[in-house]
């Protein structure tokens, strides 16, 4: 039976490495070619929206509300045109970010009203949600240090530390209240983090009959 697995976390949390570990673990269980997605993005139209969110426009500031609407527009395209069709075909989907990112970054970081965020989510997604979310938790200071070491920062990554602290608080709030979210301490050494991801995913796969 197809499943939708998402990897979440702040900048520098090691999501890319986590995704590799997830894909390798799934392959060991015979799930060799899952559909992989990223948000924002993942379709031609959604990638255009990603560029606006990540880079903005040189001649016009992107308002927080416009950013929020772009993110949900991109998500609607991806879910409707890629994720749901793949799941309907019986394929597994592994996503780099999903709605939890908006709840954390726009709801927590930007400070949008909780009711508005839930209304946006429910309007665009209804009862659709990932079967499993692996949240890579990291101290924002360490995460930003890692992100800076990778090179030039995008528009979101250039936000001040308190933005990411608020985003992390919201991430943890959801993670502590939703059994479908597994929290990994991403501030540890790479080997420990890798083992934690594999162990958690293996246990989840066994529990879910794979």
Swiss-Prot record:
CDD domains: TMPK
Transmembrane feature ranges: none
Enzyme class, spelled out: transferase
PROSITE patterns: THYMIDYLATE_KINASE
GO CC list: cytosol
Assigned keywords, A-Z: ATP-binding, Kinase, Nucleotide biosynthesis, Nucleotide-binding, Transferase
Enzyme nomenclature, EC number: 2.7.4.9
GO biological process annotation, one example: dTDP biosynthetic process
PANTHER family the UniProt entry points to: THYMIDYLATE KINASE, UMP-CMP KINASE 2, MITOCHONDRIAL
Protein name listed in UniProt: Thymidylate kinase
Native source organism of the sequence: Aliivibrio fischeri (strain ATCC 700601 / ES114) (Vibrio fischeri)
Source species taxonomy: Bacteria, Pseudomonadati, Pseudomonadota, Gammaproteobacteria, Vibrionales
Gene: tmk
